[in-house]
């Protein structure tokens, strides 16, 4: 994150909302290539009450940022996205980002907030960190990967164990 600047949320002078525009140096993109090639700026609401994200600008800190590409091509992030300093990611998360996650885009992760919760399709993995630990990015997020099997179903795989034969193309 090389700089931050407070900018109007829209060109409408009656709109009093503000955004923070972070200028970034993109190191690697893991998905979304079809929507945008290179990201120079990311936007977030100015107010934390609107789920705005505060990042450290002008530091050497590197982040994993997830967000949305809006119809106007701007990349938007907020508190509900997964945003983590790269150094805080587990080894499994870093290896999976570089080698496994892109193979499993057909898998859907369903967050379990309360019981009962179930999957509704064979390509879903049930994410239980919130239910068990009351945090979204707990042990399951740090140490497991939702992976596709040869038969098209998806299930959790513990990242540091050797891959079993039933997992596809790995």
Swiss-Prot record:
Q: What is its main location?
A: secreted
Q: Which InterPro entries match?
A: Netrin_domain, TIMP, TIMP-like_OB-fold, TIMP_C
Q: Where in the cell is it found?
A: Secreted
The SS bond pairs are 107-154, 112-117, 125-146
One Pfam family this chain carries?
TIMP
The record's Gene Ontology biological-process terms are:
negative regulation of membrane protein ectodomain proteolysis; response to cytokine; response to hormone
Instruction: Cite the NTR domain residue spans from the record.
Output: 1-105
What GO MF annotations does this protein's record show?
A: metalloendopeptidase inhibitor activity; protease binding
Question: Is the keyword Secreted assigned to this protein?
Answer: yes
Q: Where is this region: Involved in metalloproteinase-binding?
A: 6-9, 48-49
Family, per entry: Belongs to the protease inhibitor I35 (TIMP) family.
Q: What is this protein called?
A: Metalloproteinase inhibitor 4
| Protein species of origin | Oryctolagus cuniculus
Name the gene that codes for it.
TIMP4
